[in-house]
Amino acid sequence: MRCLALDIGGTKIAAAIVKNGEIEQRQQIHTPRENVVEGMHQALGKLLADYEGQFDYVAVASTGIINNGILSALNPKNLGGLAEFPLKASIAKHTDKPIGLLNDAQAATYAEYQLQNSEQVSNFVFITVSTGVGGGIVLNQILQTGSRGIAGHIGHTLADPNGAICGCGRRGCVEAIASGRAIEAVSSQWEDPCDPKEVFERFRKNDEKATALVERSAKAIANLIADLVISLDIQKIAIGGSVGLAEGYLSLVEKYLQDFPSIYCCEIETAKFGQDAGLIGAAYWVKDVLLDKPEGTIYG
């Protein structure tokens, strides 16, 4: 089956035909920044028209929370005016093909899980440490999306009850400590301020302040991993994102994991899919749901 896959992010919308896990005719446009609701309707309509007659179903990976086809977020400000946007209905105006939607981190998780031996790894987690911290959870070989679409928002578990206020409104979330945004919140206040990329450059040069800041992030992720393993019996975790894949970061996470009893640990690896993980994962997931639900019922 041919899939029109869409990956909707805060700054870009990627689209491609996905067939047998291969991406064709990929294009990318900017996410609307002005008149965002009407702009998004128009952008989706144009993308559907561009690929008309070339797909059998539509799969969407999107930032935020997808619940009954509606786009929302723990922090609505992250959507730039698109909170409560009728994403599925907007797409359905332009096609009668089946449509499936899920969160972009959930989609990336499903893509990464395709690389695993499901007989050996039935419980799997993907963690992305980037501007924010997100992820997805596979239990008993099934991607967990939840009744409200929020399953896998692991960046909003507690890291420090006395920590900074997170964008979601809660104090001390993992995201408020480990993310690129959290790193920059500290480094931008230094006498010699810098962005997260330079923080890691200084870290690799053994700068004391940068090292402490990166270690703080890595410790939070190590504790998150331990919590996931002990609560869900996770067998393997893949880590991605611009922070998660930064040179030296994963080894720090593994170092802090070694301080825990072994029962809190599992195999850790770097994520293999890059920027197209959402496109590929969404295409695979919706196809699998279609096969499992012959009547055509699609989640999202």
Swiss-Prot record:
GO terms for molecular function: ATP binding; N-acylmannosamine kinase activity; zinc ion binding. Its EC number is 2.7.1.60. One of its GO terms (biological process) is N-acetylneuraminate catabolic process. Zn(2+) binds at H156, C166, C168, C173. It catalyses: an N-acyl-D-mannosamine + ATP = an N-acyl-D-mannosamine 6-phosphate + ADP + H(+). InterPro entries: ATPase_NBD, ManNAc_kinase_bac, ROK, ROK_cs. Homodimer. Belongs to the ROK (NagC/XylR) family. NanK subfamily. Catalyzes the phosphorylation of N-acetylmannosamine (ManNAc) to ManNAc-6-P. It holds the Pfam family ROK. This is N-acetylmannosamine kinase. The lineage of its organism: Bacteria, Pseudomonadati, Pseudomonadota, Gammaproteobacteria, Pasteurellales. Pathway: Amino-sugar metabolism; N-acetylneuraminate degradation; D-fructose 6-phosphate from N-acetylneuraminate: step 2/5. ATP binds at residues 5-12, 132-139. Gene3D superfamilies: 3.30.420.40. PANTHER family: N-ACETYLMANNOSAMINE KINASE, ROK (REPRESSOR, ORF, KINASE) FAMILY.
